[in-house]
Amino acid sequence: MDMAHYIDGFVLPIPRDRLSAYENLVKAVAEIWKEHGALDYLEYIGDDLTLEGTRSFADLVDATEDEAVLFGWVVFDSRETRDLANEKVANDPRMAELVASSNSGFNAKRMVYGGFRSLVQSRSTGAV
């Protein structure tokens, strides 16, 4: 099965004392993204961020000791679908309302972000 998806990937710091509020925000935001064309929306919290000889995600976003590092991606069936979804999400009034009211500590200026086309996709038969 060759499914060459397109993804938006991102890494960002969130204050640890606001993780619950951020999680609630992301649950709502994920549904909006899927409503506008995303196939999947995933975010993970950093648990093991150091490997000798490499630059850590925490360094990448200048995370402090009081911040958790989140890594996520949004999956689309194509770049075209992603571009349309980005436009729709940017114009969806629910997004600004959610972020403004969430008290989640989200700061887009500290987020590292980019769009990526598929290079290799190797999955186990039973993989999620």
Model-derived regions: residue spans:
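Short amphipathic alpha-helices in soluble, non-transmembrane regions
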Residues: 23-29, 85-93
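A broad, low-specificity signal for short, low-complexity segments enriched in glycine/proline
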Residues: 1-4, 30-38, 72-76
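Positively charged, small/polar-rich N-terminal and surface patches that mediate targeting and assembly
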Residues: 18-20, 24-34, 38-40, 67, ...
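Long, hydrophobic N-terminal alpha-helical segment
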Residues: 2-28
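Short, well-ordered beta-strand segments in beta-rich or mixed alpha/beta enzyme
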Residues: 7-14, 52-89
